[in-house]
Amino acid sequence: MSEPLILGIESSCDETGVGIVRGNDLLANEVASSMEQHVRFGGVVPEVASRAHLEAIVPVLDKAASTAGVDLSELDGIAVTAGPGLAGALVVGLSAAKALASWLNKPLYGVNHLAGHVAVDLLEHGELPMPCGALLVSGGHTSLLWVNDIATDIIEVGSTIDDAAGEAYDKVARVLGLPYPGGPVIDKAAAEGDPTAIRFPRGLTARHDMVKHRFDYSFSGLKTAVSRWVETQQRDGVEFRIADVAASFQEAVADVLTAKAVDMCQEYGLTHFLIGGGVAANSRLRTLLAERMADAGVELRRPRPGLCTDNGAMIAALGVQVVKAGLPASAMDISADSGLPIETVLV
């Protein structure tokens, strides 16, 4: 039996992505980002994102089909992000997928955006031994997952109880007078700084947190600590290096993310682990996680940075797994679900 040929559409936030995948082979991955339109607002504006998706979806779709060199009539199915994400943005991608599936008379698969971040690793490293652990870290989500089967059985073991890691990056960047989005600019600034210059707090790592929040994250306190530290220095007229603050903040984030990931692997006897999501492109996080997983005897899978951010290829990759699992197609009247839980891989 030939490998499924799946087209994936992603529109959960500010990237309009279309990917085409045959099995674990990536044929096309085209992305149009509306990031520049959100910079002056200091964050993603849902209405602006939705309008950008409307303008970009057809050109991106055409480019992906051309790059892949396949006739859309050859597709075995259309996969699309059904959630979680911005409601209006999701509707644009879902509507496009429904129209395409109807026109081509192909099955529609509404899938979970977060599970897509797990599935995308298959495109780079091939089949993933199960069970495995996963850390998904982005602007909207920070979760530790137990993955028994990418298409049917993903369990959230821990998550953030307040801000996601990516949100903290954006807010700290604003405090430091750095532009949006905060992740890349703080990563760049931190490269010139001293990560030991300031000891910022690591949320939910105290002994009393281990009972209820052993595998959960909290970045609100860290964000506040950085803000207050900067305010104090400015009030007292003390000069400081932005690079040192950025590096110290980034070290705190990477430290707690990786420590809990390793703890999860040791607690559940996991020997394979992967990382995904936009913040997974962060250089310090990738390096520290690799070091700590190696010390723990756990094989780490890290997709290249370009596959960590939102894209259509990850949705197509997940669609392939759904088809190979023999799961039924989604109904054509499915709705977008901005709060779709990770446990629901297929809608």
Curated annotation (Swiss-Prot):
<comment type="function">
    <text>Required for the formation of a threonylcarbamoyl group on adenosine at position 37 (t(6)A37) in tRNAs that read codons beginning with adenine. Is involved in the transfer of the threonylcarbamoyl moiety of threonylcarbamoyl-AMP (TC-AMP) to the N6 group of A37, together with TsaE and TsaB. TsaD likely plays a direct catalytic role in this reaction.</text>
</comment>
<feature type="binding site">
    <location>
        <position position="310"/>
    </location>
    <ligand>
        <name>Fe cation</name>
    </ligand>
</feature>
<keyword id="KW-0408">Iron</keyword>
<dbReference type="InterPro" id="IPR043129">
    <property type="entry name" value="ATPase_NBD"/>
</dbReference>
<protein>
    <recommendedName>
        <fullName>tRNA N6-adenosine threonylcarbamoyltransferase</fullName>
        <ecNumber>2.3.1.234</ecNumber>
    </recommendedName>
</protein>
<keyword id="KW-0808">Transferase</keyword>
<dbReference type="GO" id="GO:0005506">
    <property type="term" value="F:iron ion binding"/>
</dbReference>
<dbReference type="InterPro" id="IPR017860">
    <property type="entry name" value="Peptidase_M22_CS"/>
</dbReference>
<keyword id="KW-0479">Metal-binding</keyword>
<feature type="binding site">
    <location>
        <position position="183"/>
    </location>
    <ligand>
        <name>substrate</name>
    </ligand>
</feature>
<feature type="binding site">
    <location>
        <position position="170"/>
    </location>
    <ligand>
        <name>substrate</name>
    </ligand>
</feature>
<feature type="binding site">
    <location>
        <position position="117"/>
    </location>
    <ligand>
        <name>Fe cation</name>
    </ligand>
</feature>
<keyword id="KW-0963">Cytoplasm</keyword>
<dbReference type="GO" id="GO:0002949">
    <property type="term" value="P:tRNA threonylcarbamoyladenosine modification"/>
</dbReference>
<keyword id="KW-0819">tRNA processing</keyword>
<dbReference type="GO" id="GO:0061711">
    <property type="term" value="F:N(6)-L-threonylcarbamoyladenine synthase activity"/>
</dbReference>
<dbReference type="InterPro" id="IPR000905">
    <property type="entry name" value="Gcp-like_dom"/>
</dbReference>
<comment type="similarity">
    <text>Belongs to the KAE1 / TsaD family.</text>
</comment>
<dbReference type="Pfam" id="PF00814">
    <property type="entry name" value="TsaD"/>
</dbReference>
<feature type="binding site">
    <location>
        <position position="113"/>
    </location>
    <ligand>
        <name>Fe cation</name>
    </ligand>
</feature>
<keyword id="KW-0012">Acyltransferase</keyword>
<dbReference type="InterPro" id="IPR017861">
    <property type="entry name" value="KAE1/TsaD"/>
</dbReference>
<feature type="binding site">
    <location>
        <position position="187"/>
    </location>
    <ligand>
        <name>substrate</name>
    </ligand>
</feature>
<feature type="binding site">
    <location>
        <position position="282"/>
    </location>
    <ligand>
        <name>substrate</name>
    </ligand>
</feature>
<feature type="binding site">
    <location>
        <begin position="136"/>
        <end position="140"/>
    </location>
    <ligand>
        <name>substrate</name>
    </ligand>
</feature>
<dbReference type="InterPro" id="IPR022450">
    <property type="entry name" value="TsaD"/>
</dbReference>
<dbReference type="GO" id="GO:0005737">
    <property type="term" value="C:cytoplasm"/>
</dbReference>
